[in-house]
UniProtKB/Swiss-Prot annotation:
PROSITE patterns: COA_CT_CTER (PS50989)
Protein name: Acetyl-coenzyme A carboxylase carboxyl transferase subunit alpha
Family under the similarity heading: Belongs to the AccA family.
UniProt record, GO biological process: fatty acid biosynthetic process; malonyl-CoA biosynthetic process
Length: 316
């Protein structure tokens, strides 16, 4: 199976294979088969619209983890100019699972911070599969406090299975680092916009997710635990992950309905990985509009709005 397609996309993959086969035949025999190719392309588009119009929560979770899905550094390349990455937490080390630095969005200075997964095996290991250790969160905190000092808005990109649960991370204060970030972000005197671009896993996501405006891409997820983890606890088997995904309400539309997410940003047909440039432009438009709105607020009003937003979560 084509690695760019997930299991539920197999009918689309089969059609695409036929289209490619016809193109090769046409090139070899100089036959005019453009009409047949156009017919199959229309059929593929209609099939894609039908499949993606009826996705389950589990299928959306699979899309959020797609190996070709754009990561933070991809969006930084599309959205920002003059990006200068900053390293280290000034306590222990630098954590490649979180990237951050100063940049310009349409000429205006901003602080950009986000989780970063890897593509190839070596990079996946170096970035710990996007699971930060305490030094990653402390680095993020350092950059956010710097942004406040220099009056720069903060833009975060969330994409992590969760904070790294290893012994070394716990020994260095993983839970304290996350809790400290929540405290600091709740009080920062600068606008904060967070965007979930893939997986939003538990406290590992929330540690850079306290914000004035929360966006989610259409096929991203946000949850307190992975579907597999939830299924292993409730049903004693990860095979119940599809049921767990549905029960937890991990999708953007579901969370928008609960008032947790402010904006769901539509993805290109087939997902962000099908057209990263178009996806980035959609994100750019939302970020610029939201920044304009937030920067128009008095600081006291901004902080009160953030406090009210946080306190509105949960049952009354």
């Amino acid at each position: 199976m084509n690695p760019n397609f997930l299991d539920f996309e197999q009918p689309i993959a089969d059609l695409q294979a036929k289209i490619e086969e016809l193109r090769l035949v046409g090139n070899d025999n100089a036959l005019n088969i453009s009409d047949e190719i156009s017919r199959l392309q229309d059929k593929s588009k209609a099939l894609t619209e039908n499949i993606f119009g009826n996705l389950s929560s589990w299928q959306i979770a699979q899309l959020a983890r797609h190996p070709k899905r754009p990561y933070t550094l991809d969006y930084i390349g599309y959205l920002f100019s003059d990006f200068e990455e900053l390293h280290g937490d000034r306590h222990f080390a630098d954590d490649p699972a979180i990237v951050g630095g100063v940049a310009r969005l349409d000429g205006s200075p901003v602080m950009v911070i986000g989780h970063q997964k890897g593509r190839e095996v070596r990079e996946k290991v170096r970035r710990n599969f996007g699971m930060p250790r305490p030094e990653g969160y402390r680095k993020a905190c350092r950059l956010m406090e710097m942004a406040e000092r220099f009056k720069m808005p903060i833009l975060t990109f969330i994409d992590t299975p969760g904070a790294y649960p290893g012994i070394d991370a716990e020994e260095r204060g993983q839970s304290e680092a996350i809790a400290w970030n929540l405290r600091v972000m709740a009080r920062l005197k600068t606008p904060i916009i967070a965007t979930v671009i893939g997986e939003g896993g538990s406290g590992g996501a929330l540690a850079i997710g306290v914000c004035d405006q929360l966006n989610m891409l259409q096929y991203s997820t946000y949850s307190v635990i992975s579907p597999e983890g939830c299924a292993s606890i409730l049903w004693k088997t990860a095979e119940k992950a599809p049921e767990a995904a549905e029960a937890m309400g991990i999708t953007a539309e579901r969370l928008k309905g609960l008032g947790i997410v402010d904006k769901v940003i539509d993805e290109p047909l087939g997902g962000a990985h099908r057209d990263p440039a178009s996806m980035a432009e959609s994100i750019r438009g939302e970020l610029l509009a939201q920044l304009k709105m937030l920067q128009g607020l008095e600081m006291g009003e901004l902080l009160e709005r953030r406090y009210d937003r946080l306190m509105s979560y949960g049952a009354p």
